[in-house]
UniProtKB/Swiss-Prot annotation:
Domain Cyclin N-terminal: 28-152
Cross-referenced InterPro entries: Cyclin (IPR039361), Cyclin-like_dom (IPR013763), Cyclin-like_sf (IPR036915), Cyclin_C-dom (IPR004367), Cyclin_N (IPR006671), Cyclins_cyclin-box (IPR048258)
Superkingdom as given in the UniProt entry: Eukaryota
Stretches for region Disordered: 269-295
Protein's name according to its UniProt entry: G1/S-specific cyclin-D1
Upper lineage: Eukaryota, Metazoa, Chordata, Craniata, Vertebrata
One function term, GO molecular function aspect: kinase activity
Subunit: Interacts with either CDK4 or CDK6 protein kinase to form a serine/threonine kinase holoenzyme complex. The cyclin subunit imparts substrate specificity to the complex. Component of the ternary complex CCND1/CDK4/CDKN1B required for nuclear translocation and modulation of CDK4-mediated kinase activity. Interacts directly with CDKN1B. Can form similar complexes with either CDKN1A or CDKN2A. Interacts with UHRF2; the interaction ubiquitinates CCND1 and appears to occur independently of phosphorylation. Interacts with USP2.
PTM notes: Phosphorylation at Thr-286 by MAP kinases is required for ubiquitination and degradation by the DCX(AMBRA1) complex. It also plays an essential role for recognition by the FBXO31 component of SCF (SKP1-cullin-F-box) protein ligase complex following DNA damage. Ubiquitinated at Lys-269 by the DCX(AMBRA1) complex during the transition from G1 to S cell phase, leading to its degradation: ubiquitination is dependent on Thr-286 phosphorylation. The DCX(AMBRA1) complex represents the major regulator of CCND1 stability during the G1/S transition. Also ubiquitinated by the SCF(FBXO4) and Cul7-RING(FBXW8) ubiquitin-protein ligase complexes. Following DNA damage it is ubiquitinated by the SCF(FBXO31) protein ligase complex. SCF(FBXO31) ubiquitination is dependent on Thr-286 phosphorylation.
The entry's keywords: Cell cycle, Cell division, Cyclin, Cytoplasm, Isopeptide bond, Membrane, Nucleus, Phosphoprotein, Repressor, Transcription, Transcription regulation, Ubl conjugation
Family: Belongs to the cyclin family. Cyclin D subfamily.
Gene (UniProt): Ccnd1
Phosphothreonine: residues bearing it: T286
Length: 295
């Protein structure tokens, strides 16, 4: 009797059906033209910030990613929040004691832009171990949006991934795997300051190629083999193939170092032994197998 009134409904997010009109070349051209308008400065650590250094950005970015993952935020929230953070730091000097406040505020605003049910100020304050108050976060929100001149609809690599996949004659199940791994690479790139200089379209294209190469989805005789895919996507985003290939190699190197760091945190002794073997064997010329990554 007590189970008769038990509610077994599961809340699902209602999503619109894919619209092919939003994936045509005209939209992509407009996105490529717009992406530069919301790009942060690549030299703000030297020219603007006095206390904040790249290692601090890495720490707060990792924390922001963990919060977004634990709250199961949309994939676009974290890269968009990092775009806000970098653009703000490109304009305004900030004390290092307020960097976590800025990170929480960027997630707060980004979730309003991309989430059906955005993160609350109170919940974000809990993730800071109550080191900030909701009132401080709301005040910082006003400062953030004013400094960004309310230009909050910035392009992120996620906006380009679907365009690239729609142009590839891959099977739907393969596209789903590529999409998932490419999204993981995009989040990983957002934590690393080296990728600030790359436009979102290049990060997205590099992530797609890196995902395909790691998953071995491109055969040598296939149009979508990694070499041809790189040239194809470089034409799509109108960039030099060598620049795109360099971005892809950066992504693969970042993935490899992240996996090594994660393994070191689990078993430091085993990592030291593996490091000695790697030094003798030299660096591998093939990228890390992305199937080893826990998505």
């Amino acid at each position: 009797m007590e189970h008769q009134l038990l509610c077994c409904e599961v809340e699902t997010i209602r999503r619109a059906y894919p619209d092919t009109n939003l994936l045509n070349d005209r939209v992509l051209r407009a996105m490529l033209k717009t992406e530069e308008t919301c790009a942060p400065s690549v030299s703000y650590f030297k020219c603007v910030q006095r206390e904040i250094v790249p290692s601090m950005r890495k720490i707060v970015a990792t924390w922001m990613l963990e919060v977004c993952e634990e709250q199961k935020c949309e994939e676009e929230v974290f890269p968009l929040a990092m775009n806000y953070l970098d653009r703000f730091l490109s304009l305004e000097p900030l004390k290092k004691s307020r960097l976590q406040l800025l990170g929480a505020t960027c997630m707060f605003v980004a979730s309003k832009m991309k989430e059906t049910i955005p993160l609350t100020a109170e919940k974000l304050c809990i993730y800071t171990d109550n080191s900030i108050r909701p009132e401080e976060l709301l005040q910082m929100e006003l400062l953030l949006v004013n400094k960004l001149k309310w230009n909050l609809a910035a392009m992120t690599p996620h906006d380009f991934i679907e365009h690239f996949l729609s142009k590839m004659p891959e099977a739907d199940e393969n596209k789903q795997i590529i999409r998932k791994h490419a999204q993981t690479f995009v989040a990983l790139c957002a934590t690393d300051v080296k990728f600030i200089s790359n436009p979102p379209s290049m990060v997205a294209a590099g992530s797609v190629v890196a995902a395909m190469q790691g998953l071995n989805l491109g055969s040598p005789n296939n149009f979508l083999s990694c070499y041809r895919t790189t040239h194809f996507l470089s034409r799509v985003i109108k960039c030099d193939p060598d620049c795109l290939r360099a971005c892809q190699e950066q992504i693969e190197a970042l993935l490899e170092s992240s996996l090594r760091q994660a393994q070191q945190n689990i078993d430091p002794k085993a990592t030291e032994e593996e490091g000695e073997v790697e030094e003798e064997a030299g660096l591998a010329c093939t990228p890390t197998d992305v199937r080893d990554v826990d998505i």
